[in-house]
Design a protein with these regions (language model features):
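An aromatic- and glycine-enriched ligand-binding surface/loop that stacks and positions planar moieties
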Residues: 1-10, 62, 83, 87, ...
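Bilobed periplasmic-binding protein-like "clamshell/Venus-flytrap" ligand-binding domains
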Residues: 406-422
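Surface-exposed intrinsically disordered loops and tails
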Residues: 108, 374-393, 441-467
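Active/binding-pocket-proximal capping segment
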Residues: 337-343, 353-384
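Carbohydrate-binding/catalytic loop surfaces
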Residues: 94, 193-221, 305-312, 318-319, ...
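Conserved, well-structured interaction surfaces
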Residues: 4-80, 95-110, 114-131, 270, ...
Length: 468
């Protein structure tokens, strides 16, 4: 959801980032029950008294279990950094083991890599109907994510005292991503489908398996539902999470040039700023032609959207899915698009990315979004707005554009907070203004989406529906 990040305004700040609010009494992330179950299974598989299947089948099951252990520990690593590594199930009498000191980041990342390498080598599935079963590509993709995070964290936090260098981890990230790129048969979804090539990835009940490597699948017949509409469309549950304008400004124009190159970009109306932009923008927020229950609708600024940029990326376009766990669309956990971005960033950080690799990764993602310019060759010009607003310490136009692309492609997928932490950009959560759509003036009706119908009437401190 990215509920804790810089690019989304929320009605209430998470206790995790409130000073003094997150402690041992309130923490919900210091749970080890899942690891106990995983290690119990691993220990049992490795004990011939209990596991009597042949070695290939056993190693397949071990690979799956070790993937889940890596998933568990990656969350611990990003949340806490150094944590105790437990390779086996702990018994209640083993207090000396249970209360051991934290292990170093080197210990954690080495074991994460070992688990994911084992999973890649031994998980037998190479494809999955509905992307709901672990495959070896899920192992390689997760490894690229894990290694990229830790490489950047070490580089940008200057952790020179650690043994494993950022360069080593960037190379591991690139190698893992390249395995997926070269061998998995995955590709970007480019069919326009129901809602557009990008939004369909999050709208469909059945995952688009050519791009979605792993997903949580809803199933109406089995009574498995999601909460996306409830979270994004109900004040009673969600946080009114809405994109902020400074981030919306980073979506490129269709010709590949920055929207902020226009002298009057800051005073453009909502309709004007949606025109001729990266197609993902109107597949992420309610745009000019958005239909709700089959009728034209704008962002619910009065009740739900704090900024006027109401997110639709995960929601279904009917009110019957609001107000509870009712969604029947599946949620991607790992996508091929992320793997491409992981590869591009790792290669760029190593200083070895080529024009062809740019075209394969960032260029391909932008082409899907309708962008025509700058997709084949590496960028050579720094976008001053992007640098000034988000990354003032980054001077490489290639890295800046990769960060732009990552933020846009993966928005609301739960990646942004980790990205901010690994790049040492957490201050953006303090400094980036929560600004919304441009309002030309108070005490006058506003037609938000340009359909000729006035939508809102803004006065000081209040928003109401426009008078008929």
């Amino acid at each position: 959801q990215d509920k804790m990040c810089d690019v989304g305004a929320v009605s209430n700040t998470d206790t995790f980032i409130k000073q003094g609010a997150y402690n041992t009494e309130t923490a919900t992330s210091w749970s080890w029950g899942a690891l106990k179950n995983i290690n119990y299974f691993i220990d049992g598989c490795n004990d011939p008294k209990y596991c009597t299947v042949d070695d290939n089948r056993r190693d397949n099951y071990l690979g799956i279990a070790r993937w889940f252990r890596a998933w568990f520990y990656y969350d611990k690593l990003t949340t806490y950094g150094e944590v105790p590594w437990f390779p086996h199930d702990i018994q209640s009498y083993q207090n000396d083991v249970m209360y051991k000191d934290r292990d170093s980041r080197d210990v954690i990342i080495r074991n994460l890599i070992a688990d994911l390498d084992f999973a890649y080598e031994h998980i037998q599935a190479t494809s999955s109907t509905g992307s709901s079963t672990l495959t070896r590509w899920a192992a390689a993709a997760l490894k690229s994510r894990v290694c990229l995070f830790e490489a950047a964290y070490r580089r940008y936090h200057n952790l020179t005292e650690l043994e494993i260098t950022p360069e080593e981890l960037y190379r591991e990230a690139a190698k893992a991503a390249k395995l997926v790129i070269d061998n998995s048969g995955c590709s970007l979804n480019t069919a326009t489908g129901k809602k557009g090539a990008y939004r369909d990835l999050f709208y469909n009940e059945t995952p688009l398996t050519q791009e979605v490597i792993l997903a949580v699948c809803a199933n109406e017949k089995s009574g498995i539902f999601g909460e996306q509409n409830w979270w994004f469309n109900a004040r009673s549950y969600g946080l009114c999470w809405s994109l902020v304008r400074s981030f919306v400004h980073t979506y490129l124009k269709l010709d590949g040039t920055p929207f902020t190159d226009a002298a009057d970009y800051a005073v453009k109306s909502f309709t004007e700023e949606m025109e001729g932009r990266d197609l993902r923008l109107e597949q992420t927020v309610r745009g000019r032609n958005f239909l709700w229950d089959g009728k034209t609708a704008v962002a619910d600024i009065k009740n739900l959207s704090l900024t006027g940029y109401q997110v639709i990326k995960y929601t279904l376009d009917e009110s019957k899915y609001d107000g509870g766990a009712k969604n029947i669309n599946s949620i991607p956990l790992i996508r091929y698009a992320e793997v491409l971005l992981n590869y591009a960033e790792a290669q760029a950080e190593l200083g070895v990315i080529t024009d062809s690799e740019w075209a394969l990764t960032v260029g391909a993602l932008r082409k899907r979004a309708g962008i025509t310019g700058g997709t084949e060759t590496l960028p050579t010009t720094v976008d001053g707005y992007l640098q000034r607003t988000f990354y003032p310490d980054v001077t490489s136009p290639v890295l800046l554009e990769i960060r732009r692309e990552r933020a846009i492609e993966l928005v609301a997928e739960g990646m942004r907070f980790d990205d901010l932490r690994r790049w040492k950009c957490g201050s953006l959560m303090e400094t980036l203004p929560w600004s919304g759509i441009h309002i030309p003036g108070l005490e006058q009706p506003v037609d938000v989406n340009g359909d000729g119908v006035d939508d809102y009437y803004f006065t000081e401190g209040e928003v109401t529906a426009a008078p008929a």
